[in-house]
Every structure is written in structure tokens, then in C-alpha cells.
């Protein structure tokens, strides 16, 4: 029950999302990649972390005073007074930077060339809403709904999901809330899904592929999302789309859900629906896909992974994983220029990590 630094062989996203931020000051893992979902969650939760470290770690450090310097990739065990003083100074400087950023709240986000952009937050559950409001985000650009599944040992019911989505929408008070449908697979695993082991899960049955092959799970989530959309500005986003045929199948299932809700006399909204652009296939098909949806969301982490043919979970490849690689930037440029087919007043493109 005391504040601590967790040292582990590895932490899965499902374990990371359940960490108590009031007690876990930091964590260090021997395995893992700085580009993994565990690393992304650490940043989202504002928990300093060292992931995939080559620093020797033994049971001998258990119970000792430690300092984790996530910025420089260092861990200090039983630090001397001089090191303590330096680290406290760095922590103070970091706090001052955060306070300076708070002074920017309420101002418009304008680029150097005068373009106004919207800055939205990414969240994994309703617990993240306090930080969203505190930092004056213009909305929620990505609600990773899969963490509602990862935090538990059984499937969340329609009612449980509905209440969470509704709470988020009402808390945001009319600001956009973009909820991504279930994106399980790769490094995000749930035992109760009973998924077969795969040699290359990043290329396997994940995200929309699971939803389309197990429509009963998908329909439960869609019912909750459409019901919640009656209480706020919710949009629905589908991950790992690679073809128009997938979108057509989604639309068929959505039509079934809306028909069922109508027949049952259950109120629901008409949320905008978009897709994730995460693969070269989606980039090359974007002109056709744009005719089917209201918006695109470019997921740069997976787009980088699939464009560069680099496993983002492999720490040995971290040096080669470059989201600023010219090929990745050209992929993004292809999607945001007018000829992509989505540039209009009604439709939009967003980018997230």
C-alpha cells in the first residue's frame, strides 16, 4: 500500500491499464519495445517508464530506494545525495514546464503558417477524463474501447458499455468523442476471447477481423455505441480496414443493429462513422474508401510498422522504427491532400499516435 516502482520481466497492456497511478510511481521492464501499446499507455497515464531495458535487474533491489529517469533511460538504486538533488531538480523543472503549458489553455491551436488545427486527447477509459478536462482538450480523438475488455475477466455487457460511453459523452458536453471499436489482437490479448496462438499476431486475426468473424461481440458493442450517441457528440471509428468490402459488411451489421433497436423502441443517435488508415492497402484504397465513410483517422504507429515492415514489438528494431521516414510521411501526405477524396467541409482527416 506504499508508493512504489514496479520492476518486471514484462507488462502487457492489459496489466498496465490496471495500474494504480496513485501508488505506481514508475515501472521498469526487461522486455518490450518503446513503440508498444504498453509504452503508449505509460505516456497516457503519465507514468515514467523504462521499457526493454538492458540494465541488469535482480531481486536484490527489492525494497530499496530507486529513481527512474525515463527521459535519459536511467535507473538509480540507492542513489547518493548528489544524485538525489539532481533528480529532484529535474523533477522540479519538469513540473514548471507542465505549469507553463497550463497557461496556454483556452488559446487556439494555430500552426506557423496560420492553419488552425484541433488538438484532441486519447483515452483508454473514463478515468482519463479528468486529465482531458484539466488540459482543455478540444475533444477526444481516440477512445481505445478495447481497454474496457482488457480490464476484466469476462465480456462487458451492452449495458455496462453503454453507461461508460454515455458518461464520457455527457462529460465532454458536446465536444467530439471518437470511439474506436474493439481493437484486440497483436500485443493486446484477452484470455477469455480464447484466440488461437499465432506466429505473427500483428498480421493475424485482430481488430475489425475479429469483429467481422465474431459478429455477436461486434453487435453488442455497436448497440451500446448507437444508444450512447443519443447523449452526446459521438463518432464511431473502425480499425484495421483494408478494403471497401469490409466497410460494406460493417454497414450491413450496423443496419441490423439499428433495425433491432428500432423494433425494440430503444432510442439511438446517428453518429458519424469513420475508419483507421493504418496499412499501405488502406492508403492506396483511400479514394474508394472515402466514398463510404465520414472521416479518416491515420494511425501512425501501425502505419509506420506496416510501411517499413518492422515489428513494433521487437525492441531490437527500435532504432529502425522511424515515424518520420520519408515513405511514412508520403503515405500521410497522400491521404490529406485534396485529391484523396475526403477533403471537404463535411469530412475530415485526423492523425494520432
Where do the model's predicted regions map?
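Acidic, glycine-rich flexible loop/linker segments
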Residues: 2-3, 8-135
